[in-house]
């Protein structure tokens, strides 16, 4: 006889960026503002943003997990990425000028300034813990998320029990091993079928979590075109964490 999923869950894991928090504006905006702040002409926002996407992709391929396996310091990884972002956008600065720009960018993204917390994030995490569930975060993010950024945003250990961050662990989504590591961190011999993972990517969240036996569902906060494909592929897709809580409490999800 089928029973409600909530009654069987012992742990919920949650993606961070796009699920609990979001960037304010485009990343390229902050790069341009940093250049402008030291008296330089404002670079073209769109070009810099596109340059960043290319540079970030290159760095993630050459030095995954923010340089973890190459033992590259986090600040060096980001300095290379930021420099390449500007170069790919057609902007090259001398070393002294670039250092001033970079210091501003690195400091900004190590603070709460460029991020916002979705209104339903804290209430959902608190609700989950009130149900006796262990709450974990699983994110392709560097160490500053855990140590600085999330606490500065008010998402501290009062809201979650453990975190698995790619820049600290050396494993990143969509590698299923990051979800196996989350199971280990949850402790208490929790089995995959006792865990629900919530994220915003079919490839990085839903697929690998399901592949190791976890339950999973996806959020479509920004009404993406891909959401229709997710639904057609069999995923449960919801607009926000309020809807997730309502669905779990309704006992409509069975296992």
Task: Show the residue positions of the predicted features.
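Intrinsically disordered, low-complexity regulatory segments enriched
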Residues: 82-83, 132, 165, 235
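N-terminal helical cap/lid subdomain that shapes the substrate entry/recognition surface
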Residues: 2-118, 123-126, 130-131, 147
